[in-house]
């Protein structure tokens, strides 16, 4: 039986952060998921070191080179109604997917759902990054996201949750000479797709 959500996590040399990112997905309150870790030709052994006891986790070798090719490899294997993006150096709070799926279930006119973020770094987060975080977290409803879309991408890429049919119709991630996530969100907007963020995540 197909899972509700397929989480695609492309990674190249995920280092010490990968296991924590994986654990944060497998520890979601929404349990009906699969996690596809797509290995983009890693050399650091982090993918090999993952605990594979959870049957929801699948390691997939990328069919190309680069993050877009790796994500699209996972997208081709994904079985879920929704496709979530995750990065190897991020942590998803436990309610992320439950709240996002609930939001899209309640808002059938919205095709892409993001979430708020809290930036963190070993050396601390600088004031400019704090302002960027505040701007990201202030763009919540579809009207605000569309209004701000041509300033910068209001959907943080590793928080994105897509309706699988819409994402496939858009062709997944392209490989432009600029950020692949921003390119995808601009293509989604041009296609008339709406984007939003739920409260509380």
Report each predicted region and the residues it spans.
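A conserved acidic beta->alpha catalytic loop
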Residues: 24, 31, 39-48, 87
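Conserved nucleotide-sugar donor-binding catalytic segment
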Residues: 7, 76, 115, 137-201
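A conserved hydrophobic helix/loop-capping motif in glycosyltransferases and polysaccharide synthases
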Residues: 4-17, 21, 28-29, 38
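Cell-envelope/extracellular polymer assembly enzymes that use nucleotide-activated donors
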Residues: 3-6, 24, 34, 183
